[in-house]
């Protein structure tokens, strides 16, 4: 089939000439070289277009050459052509951009000085809130060229400025100082792996203005088109010293070079659960975090960066200290007197030792996407275990590569290797039409920790607006009441031996969830549809509201019959401790930006009565009919004393939490 695709591509090229010095593929004026979806074109040398000649790419193109080869877009007269419109990387289904395929370009061997051609990259993706998290894989691109009217191709249809906090500025993340720095709009793109944050006032990347032009035949208003010179291969990053030596201060109250409190923007979803009452006291909280943008016009496959592969040709990465990857920034919120933070970000976390990913294990980063890596430590590099090499992460497919398969950009997809011990259950909430609304994960393995621990785990927390998740479990099964009103979890881990057959409560907080779909994996690999037992001969179970205990099978879908389920790994004579009602999402949490504990309310609560007692039972604070539209600040003097906080909703739902202030 691939040969047929290649042949078709060749026949569709009009005016194609071969043989110019250091150029294998030359596209003359008025010619179109069309690369269809799923097709692959290999160029063993340089490539150039002339005049209005077009390389229209809906599939995959490889340009493999040497330092003397070139990648050019030329005018009819032979000069350098810089306005684009020649090498076009298409978004094949803009209306369904999240699932659409797209054209990809792989360049290797060419020197940066010989890459002068302009690539047009069609861009449309979900909006990230107040600041768009983005990679700009364009060499030496002037930042102000992103500015323009809603009818100017090559721009984002707005004007960027240098005014911090205006939501019109361009920011870049600096790993060493843990700061978002202003990038002057007169500057050029500073580095191939830079993580950018574009102020999104007047910008919706999911819905281009109707007047925004596109390269024909794409209709106006269907995509943004960003233009620039691609980077040469060779991108690497040393993963050391992120925020090393920085004193964040008590509760993150120290300030950075912009006089911003660290706790107003710096998040560490990985280390939060180590001490939820004061996460900033954890030695590694906010440190060893590295933010990058994809430097290339190909996907990046991050699934194997933490392991020593079985293949002969690998991705050249074995970062054994990896703790997790944030692969989706969620929604960025900027709140007055609070700061800027991310909500509903998505994570893949890794077990310790010989890392195995847990969570959304796909780990494919698309062109122009960003990602964040958290390491467990800042140890010195040993045999390259702290260097991220980007070149062999490049991949055309949107599925991970198997570790036993030799690396190439076209390598086969991930296949079962049956040598893992991480068993993972994904629970996906679907609406009436079968569309995904939310998901959560339950993972078990021999070295996992049951219940709360101060040590790093694969767990990630949820916010009050999430609608599906689990809570920290008690070692005997059920919810640990000590943490039920402190946090709940997107990824939850338990030890497969000491939590065998015990209940992990699953809570639903939306009547829109009509079905639950189950996704069963072992060591990241999906088991076959309909299969229950894993390699241990043991599988997952669920208990519904009617009390029936049922096996869970891969790709199984069940109708929702209540808002509380129990999940189990393994079936024992006594299946753990059940929970008869789900906890509230109202939490008592520490807000470092104001140095106070706050009550953060479940969105279903309208009003609340709040009381605070000291440990002798004396009432210290009482307030009735508190509005739940914002956090309630608990105003207590610092005395290193313990208190009990209670909150009761207008319907009588009650939460209680212990704090130390």
Where would I find each of the regions flagged by the language model?
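Sec-dependent, cleavable N-terminal signal peptides
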Residues: 1-23, 653-655, 660-661
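Extracellular, surface-exposed repeat architectures
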Residues: 92-140, 245-279
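Extended, domain-scale alpha-helical bundle/helix-rich regions
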Residues: 185-201
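Compositionally biased Ser/Thr/Gly- and acidic/asparagine-rich
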Residues: 202-631, 637-639, 649-661
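Extracellular beta-sheet-rich ligand-binding/adhesion modules
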Residues: 10, 14-109, 376-377
């Amino acid at each position: 089939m691939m040969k047929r695709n290649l042949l078709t591509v060749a026949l569709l090229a009009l005016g194609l000439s071969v043989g110019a010095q250091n150029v294998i593929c030359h596209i003359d004026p008025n010619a179109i070289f069309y690369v269809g979806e799923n097709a692959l074109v290999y160029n063993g040398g340089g490539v150039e277009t002339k005049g209005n000649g077009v390389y229209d790419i809906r599939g995959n193109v490889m340009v493999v050459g040497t330092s003397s080869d070139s990648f050019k877009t030329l005018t009819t007269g032979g000069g350098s052509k810089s306005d684009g419109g020649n090498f076009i990387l298409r978004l094949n289904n803009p209306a369904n951009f999240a699932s659409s395929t797209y054209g990809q370009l792989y360049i290797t061997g060419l020197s940066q000085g010989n890459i002068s051609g302009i690539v047009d990259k069609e861009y449309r993706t979900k909006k990230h809130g107040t600041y768009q998290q983005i990679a700009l894989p364009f060499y030496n691109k002037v930042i102000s060229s992103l500015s323009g009217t809603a009818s100017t191709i090559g721009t984002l249809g707005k004007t960027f400025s240098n005014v911090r906090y205006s939501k019109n500025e361009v920011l870049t993340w600096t790993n060493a100082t843990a700061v978002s720095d202003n990038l002057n709009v007169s500057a050029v793109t500073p580095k191939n792996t830079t993580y950018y944050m574009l102020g999104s006032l007047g910008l919706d990347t999911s819905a281009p203005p109707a007047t925004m032009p596109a390269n024909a035949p794409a209709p106006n208003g269907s995509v943004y088109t960003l233009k620039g010179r691609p980077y040469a291969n060779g991108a690497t990053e040393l993963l050391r010293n992120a925020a090393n030596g920085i004193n964040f201060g008590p509760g993150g109250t120290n300030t950075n070079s912009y006089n911003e409190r660290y706790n107003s923007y710096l998040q560490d979803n990985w280390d939060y659960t180590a001490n939820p009452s004061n996460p900033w006291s954890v030695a590694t909280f906010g440190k060893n975090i590295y933010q990058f943008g994809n430097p290339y016009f190909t996907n990046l496959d991050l699934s194997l960066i933490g392991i020593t592969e079985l293949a002969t040709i690998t991705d050249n990465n074995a970062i054994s200290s990896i703790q997790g990857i944030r692969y989706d920034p969620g929604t960025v919120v900027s709140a007055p007197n609070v700061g800027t933070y991310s909500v509903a970000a998505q994570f893949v976390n890794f077990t310790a030792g010989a890392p195995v990913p847990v969570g959304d294990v796909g780990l494919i980063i698309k062109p122009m996407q960003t990602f964040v890596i958290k390491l467990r430590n800042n140890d010195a590099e040993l045999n390259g275990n702290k260097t991220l090499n980007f070149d062999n992460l490049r991949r055309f497919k949107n599925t991970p590569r198997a570790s036993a398969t030799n690396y190439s950009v076209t390598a086969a997809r991930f296949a079962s290797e049956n040598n893992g011990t991480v068993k993972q259950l994904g629970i996906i909430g679907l609406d009436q039409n079968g569309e995904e609304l939310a998901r959560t994960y339950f993972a078990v393995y021999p070295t996992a920790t049951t219940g709360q621990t101060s040590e790093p785990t694969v767990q990630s927390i949820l916010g009050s607006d999430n609608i599906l998740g689990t809570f920290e479990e008690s070692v005997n099964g059920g919810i640990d009441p000590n943490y039920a009103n402190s946090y709940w979890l997107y990824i939850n881990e338990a030890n497969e031996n000491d939590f065998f057959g015990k209940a992990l409560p699953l809570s639903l907080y939306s009547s829109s969830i009509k079905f639950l779909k189950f996704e069963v994996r072992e060591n990241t690999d999906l088991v076959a549809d309909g299969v229950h037992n894993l390699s241990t001969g043991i599988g997952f179970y669920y208990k519904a509201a009617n009390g029936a205990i049922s096996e869970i099978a891969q790709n199984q879908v069940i109708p929702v019959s209540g808002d509380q389920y129990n999940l189990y790994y393994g079936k024992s004579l006594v299946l753990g401790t059940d929970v008869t009602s789900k906890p509230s999402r109202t939490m008592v949490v520490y807000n470092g930006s104001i140095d106070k504990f706050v009550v953060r309310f479940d969105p279903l609560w309208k009003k609340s009565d709040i009381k605070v007692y000291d440990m002798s039972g004396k009432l210290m604070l009482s307030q009735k009919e508190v509005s739940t539209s914002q956090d309630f600040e608990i105003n207590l003097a610092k005395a290193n004393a313990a208190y009990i906080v209670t909150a009761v909703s207008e319907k009588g739902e009650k939460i209680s939490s212990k704090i130390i202030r």
